[in-house]
A protein has these predicted regions:
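Glycine/proline-rich active-site loop of Rossmann-fold NAD(P)-dependent oxidoreductases
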Residues: 1-15, 20, 33, 41-52, ...
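Soluble, non-transmembrane catalytic domains of enzymes that act on hydrophobic metabolites at membranes
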Residues: 6, 26-27, 33, 125-129
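Conserved C-terminal active-site "lid" loop/helix of NAD(P)H-dependent oxidoreductases
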Residues: 67, 86-114
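Residues in well-ordered alpha-helical elements
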Residues: 33, 63, 105, 118-121
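Short, glycine/charged-enriched secondary-structure capping and boundary segments
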Residues: 8-14, 67-69, 116-117
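Amphipathic terminal alpha-helices
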Residues: 118-132
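Residue-level signal for the nucleotide or nucleotide-sugar donor/cofactor binding architecture
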Residues: 30, 60, 102, 115-118
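Mid/C-terminal beta-alpha module of Rossmann-like enzyme folds, strongest
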Residues: 38-92
Length: 132
């Protein structure tokens, strides 16, 4: 879950940021406004037997997200480390322990959801615009 108050833009802008690279590690995200709309839609169309995966349309690697943001705000991130080279204490296990691509088909079919932020690109464009 990310949005104006919860994102990695500030850490990248601080220029005190180390990129941790784990190839092939995908993660599904959702912008807070889309999450709110999905919750409201599920309350308005309750279906007790449905389980909804709440995610945008574009599972992506953290590296892809960081590349996109850094290019948009013209910051070069030179500090990077491969996840595999970190000691166990240094590993950010809560984020990197799972590798998930989530299918959001049911939120669209059953709830009629049209995502305002279908990928991290639209979401971070909004966050960057709000910070300018």
């Amino acid at each position: 879950i990310y949005g104006p108050e919860r994102n990695i833009l500030g850490r990248i802008q601080s220029r005190n940021f180390t990129r941790i690279i784990k190839k092939g590690h995908f993660f599904s995200r959702i912008y807070i406004n889309d999450l709110t709309n999905i919750i409201l839609a599920s309350m308005n169309k309750p279906n007790p037997i449905s389980i909804y995966n709440i995610a945008d349309d574009c599972p992506s690697t953290l590296d892809d997200v960081i590349d996109y943001i850094s290019k948009k705000i013209s910051i070069i991130i030179s500090d990077e480390v491969l996840y595999e080279t970190l000691s166990k204490k240094e590993q950010i296990e809560s984020f990197f322990s799972e590798n998930k691509k989530v299918n959001n088909r049911l939120i669209k079919e059953e709830l009629g959801i049209i995502l305002e932020y279908p990928s991290y690109k639209e979401g971070y464009n909004q966050i960057i615009n709000l910070n300018n």
